[in-house]
Amino acid sequence: MFWKFDLHTSSHLDTLLEKEDLSLPELLDEEDVLQECKVVNRKLLDFLLQPSHLQAMVAWVTQEPPASGEERLRYKYPSVACEILTSDVPQINDALGADESLLNRLYGFLQSGDSLNPLLASFFSKVMGILINRKTDQLVSFLRKKDDFVDLLLRHIGTSAIMDLLLRLLTCVERPQLRQDVFNWLNEEKIVQRLIEQIHPSKDDNQHSNASQSLCDIIRLSREQMIQGQDSPEPDQLLATLEKQETIEQLLSNMFEGEQCQSVIVSGIQVLLTLLEPRRPRSDSVTMNNFFSSVDGQLELLAQGALDDALSSMGALHALRPRLDRFHQLLLEPPKLEPLQMTWGSLAPPLGNTRLHVVKLLASALSANAAALTQELLVLDVPNTLLDLFFHYVFNNFLHAQVEVCVSAMLSSGPPPDSSSETPVPNPIVKHLLQHCRLVERILASWEENDRVQSGGGPRKGYMGHLTRVANAVVQNAEQGPNAEQLGQLLKELPEEQQQRWEAFVSGPLAETNKKNTVDLVNTHHLHSSSDDEDDRLKEFNFPEEAVLQQAFMDFQMQRMTSAFIDHFGFNDEEFGEQEESVNAPFDKTANITFSLNADDENPNANLLEICYKDRIQQFDDEEEEEEEGQGSAESDGEYGAWQGSQPVRASQASQPPGVRSGGSTDSEEEDEEEDEEEDEGAEQAACGRTSPSSFPSPSTQPPGPSWTATFDTVPMDAPTGPPVSKEADMSSIQIPSSPPAHGSPQLRSQDPTHPSAPQEVTDSSKVAEPLAPCQALVSVADVQATLHGMRSAPSSLDSATRDPSTSVPDFKAHQSPQTMEGKRSPEHLGLPQSQSALEMPNGSTPGGPISSGSQ
């Protein structure tokens, strides 16, 4: 991306390129020449693509400078020239691929002396690799014209860069047909046989290792292409040649010819191990049931059914069988090695790389489950030799891992593939392992010896981990597996004393070790809540009572909240842009919220919240009871409830809005309206006019009958006055009569027509009646007569004339009836103004006379 979008800074190379006498070394001394080349600087490319400059750069990467030259000539210029030639610029690639003289100059590097400069060889391999990848046709055609190309490659195969060039030639050809042509050409040149000839005691170690690595790469590359299912017109000729028995026999002959050479043996075994690797299936047979299987330390994806059917190279197995005794002899008589002084003591003789690779080869041969090969290994007593090495080299875990794999493969090996008998045939490997190799006895003896050494303060044996896995393999295969019946019978045939020791070992030390190995690395228990923690320090915190109650209330709310709250809360993305249509959508959704109101819930948090609320409510009840006791009989029987025998009706409840309190006071909104009405007197009179005709019927519409007048004494100036109440609130408390009062009922008429809350005059009795609040229930005339019976008949001497509003509060306590309904509350407790005196009749009428609209 840096080069693609031209994010580099401006360079002064353009100014430098304008010089007429500019030389190539002077240009290569610039630090940003490579960056300018990658961004395809036209002036720079024109300068570099000159034939003389291209030949100079090719000479720098192919010709070794004199040792006495400057450091820039020896290292800097060849390195910068190689980077420019391999910068993957199309113009440079085209110039190199089209100029055969430049290719000949490059090819001449292989025709130099016996040894190549490793640094120049890496430059040469890198340039040839970019040409193979970008100019495949031109370069392959050029190389096939050279008869000595394969000879030159094999001559310098000891140089790692040349081995990389051979691998690039095999892997960088993308077109299948051209790649197959390259493989056939190399097979015709007998490159496989000639690489095997390099694995010979007469060659040096570098040639051994590089030739072996090249053969292994050819095997893996060819098999990988088969797995990927790449269609090719012909089978891979190089792989077919490598898997032939004659080719393997040639390799084995070179390994054991003449004096033993560890490098030759190890390099040859690496090729054999690669050939014995199980073949992975083609991509079309791989399913979702694939699982990971470790083969020679590498993870390979194998189908479970194809793993057992995967056969190793039969040519390698047939060629390996006659040489098994030579490999077994290497285990018994290894090449001479000097003793090694280890931290735990002297190791004489060391195991060595040779015997370690031999153990790997024999383990792969046993895992192949070939009947003839297995029989030969049992005759040579190879399993017993492997166990001897296992217990002898205590701290060689490479050896322990290979022997463990070998023993596990032998215990779980099925019948030979070529066995045609329907009846199960005893597996000779399992019998040899338990009876001849005394596997169970060795496991018990080694375990007891380790316990004895550790009890004395000595170190633990290095093979104990692998020994545990071997013992588990015996137990598991005895319970289930292809040889479970045979293995169980062999365990029963052990001596009685050894059988008891084995059973005690399996149920005791082995079970304890397995339990320790399966315990989580972090020994903690997962806590579901803080109350599950057993740490006493976390239970000593004392939280304030308010915090506990607040948390309990929050828990109570969250537990009663259903999932509908989350689903219906907030705005929908689609409706958010539609402001006019969806303005009420959140309110509609909020109306659908449901909460659980189960009264039978026994949640401790809910109980705690209920107790708290009861305590606080009880405090208010106690205060109200004290106030009621202080007033005594200051309230009349009809102040706050229905008279006995009447139906209580809250007349004002249906007419008043939620904001109006029971005492006639309103919320802040109505207070604002009150201020507006005081400023505008006309609006106030209009409101009263709408109420008067319906609330106070005219005398002509009322039937004649006896009446009574209530009069009040003048209130002293120091008497407490009630709270101011708006005129609109007083008028709103007057109810519309539904029917005229009955004949003969006492009538109330207003002594002060200017205010509806003025005290009323009783016409047939002198008992003073307290004005009722708007929230009082309606009563019948009969109830009024029964209540007023026994009261004083003389009228009060109260002045019924119009009084000053500031002092027109009657003395209720002096004229109230001592009879007060039990359980009812006084107006003071409810915050009711005591200046309202509109007594509501059962039918909603007021006993007073009509009030005209102009009387306000």
Curated annotation (Swiss-Prot):
The keyword Ribonucleoprotein does not apply. Residues 621-770, 792-856 are annotated as: Disordered. Residues 10-403 are annotated as: Interaction with PPP6C. Residues 644-656, 794-809 have a biased composition (Polar residues). One of its GO terms (cellular component) is cytosol. InterPro entries: ARM-type_fold, SAPS. Residues 842-856 have a biased composition (Low complexity). GO terms for molecular function: protein phosphatase binding; protein phosphatase regulator activity; small GTPase binding. It comes from the Eukaryota. Its main location: cytoplasm. The modification Phosphothreonine is found at T524. Keywords: Cytoplasm, Phosphoprotein. Ubiquitous with highest expression in lung, spleen and bladder. It is found in: Cytoplasm. Residues 621-630, 667-683 have a biased composition (Acidic residues). It holds the Pfam family SAPS. Protein phosphatase 6 (PP6) holoenzyme is proposed to be a heterotrimeric complex formed of the catalytic subunit, a SAPS domain-containing subunit (PP6R) and an ankyrin repeat-domain containing regulatory subunit (ARS). Interacts with PPP6C and NFKBIE. Interacts with ANKRD28, ANKRD44 and ANKRD52. Belongs to the SAPS family. This is Serine/threonine-protein phosphatase 6 regulatory subunit 1. The gene is Ppp6r1.
